[in-house]
Amino acid sequence: MKTHRETLGHWLLQRITAAFLIPTILIANVSTLILLNILLFWHIHVGIEEILADYVHHEVTRNWILILLRVFCLIIIKYVFVFFVF
């Protein structure tokens, strides 16, 4: 069971990443593209992690899904970066 502090930390992390996404979309260059890419997938990852924590009750299944989610996000970040830079 999550403590109040962990829940508050996830809530703040979702709001902070969402707030940083807006200015990085408006500024268009390579460094902000990298930051946008990382922030976007980090925001997606935190959101899906919260959904899994709420609705997947079997711990082993949840851990495997989280591992696969991290691998998926890393692969997609790489492909998006390569698509926009090269």
From Swiss-Prot:
Predominant location: mitochondrion
Transmembrane segments: none
Gene3D superfamilies noted in UniProt: Fumarate reductase/succinate dehydrogenase, transmembrane subunit (1.20.1300.10)
Top-rank taxon: Eukaryota
Record key words, sorted: Mitochondrion
GO cellular component: mitochondrial inner membrane; respiratory chain complex II (succinate dehydrogenase)
UniProt-recorded name of the protein: Uncharacterized mitochondrial protein ymf17
Organism: Marchantia polymorpha (Common liverwort)
Gene that this sequence comes from: YMF17
